[in-house]
A protein has these predicted regions:
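Helical scaffold of the NTase/Pol beta-like nucleotidyltransferase catalytic core
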Residues: 1-41, 171, 175-179
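A short, surface-exposed helix-loop junction/capping segment
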Residues: 2-12, 52-55, 147, 151-152
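Charge-rich, low-complexity N-terminal segments
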Residues: 14, 24, 41-48, 52, ...
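Active-site nucleotide-donor binding segment shared across nucleotidyl transfer reactions
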Residues: 29-70, 196
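Short amphipathic alpha-helices in soluble, non-transmembrane regions
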Residues: 71-79
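Conserved catalytic core of two-metal-ion nucleotidyltransferases
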Residues: 81-118
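Catalytic cores of NTP-dependent nucleotidyl/adenyl transfer enzymes across multiple folds
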Residues: 114, 120-178
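Feature detects long, helix-prone N-terminal segments enriched in hydrophobes
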Residues: 174-231
Length: 231
């Protein structure tokens, strides 16, 4: 089964059809967008093996230029992808959606999230999926959070309450997933507090025993409601 009536909060057993439809959608978008999409990935709960999910396919499109994606708007619409300009997350994302709801019905089937490639939005989408697929016990914990919320709220419960109820788990897990994504890799860091740097505050001082810095472009996890809703 693919699709859910807009506003419903219902979970279904994992279905192999979701992976097939995700791959089909990725391939279709690649044909339409060509090199204007740096990468396209199936994300969201339907991309996480074995856990229950809303049967809506989420796709992340990574690009270097939103305008180049928008230049394909007519072709995307012809293929059933409706641009939703009121969901641009302050310029950080473009959203396209599929389903009869956008043509007078009530079903939503796909959400296409266009973000800057290698941005925090992109990293979060990919890291959360890969981390839960690598650690099925954590994926099961997440499923338990979701099923508990559905039991509490009911199938026609507040979607906002459902999204808010997942936020703490997703935020905590994303922090772990971000660190995990760098394990075993060589990274370049900007050092802003070198070895021996002295930090003085309120009567005490701290001398840094090592070089302290950050990975450029990697920020503290700040999640939007749109991101949380995909999982």
């Amino acid at each position: 089964m693919i699709g859910l009536r807009r506003g419903d909060v219902r979970l279904f057993e994992h279905n192999k059809e979701w992976k097939i439809e995700g791959e089909r959608t990725v391939n279709e978008l690649r044909k339409i967008l060509g090199s204007d999409a740096v990468d396209i990935q199936h994300i969201g709960s339907t991309s996480i093996k074995s856990i229950k999910a809303k049967p809506i396919i989420d796709i992340a499109v990574g690009t270097d230029d939103f305008n180049r994606i928008l230049s394909h708007e007519a072709e995307l619409l012809k293929a059933g992808y409706h641009y939703r300009p009121n969901h641009d997350m302050g310029g950080a994302q473009l959203l396209f959606a599929c389903g009869s709801y956008y043509e007078g019905g009530d079903m939503q089937t796909h959400f296409i999230h266009v973000v800057k490639y290698n941005s925090m939005e992109w990293r979060n989408y990919i890291n959360f999926r890969d981390y839960l697929n690598t650690y099925p016990e954590i994926a099961k914990q997440y499923e338990n959070v979701k099923t508990g919320l559905v039991e509490k709220l009911g199938s026609r419960g507040s979607r906002n309450d459902y999204v808010d109820g997942k936020a703490e788990f997703i935020s905590r897990t994303l922090r772990k997933a971000m660190v995990w994504s760098f394990l075993g890799k060589t990274v370049t860091m900007d050092i802003d507090r070198p070895l021996g740097y002295v930090h003085r505050k309120s009567g005490y001082k701290l001398v840094y025993p090592l070089n302290y810095g950050y990975i450029p472009g990697v920020l503290l996890i700040q999640l939007s409601r749109r991101f949380i809703s995909q999982y």
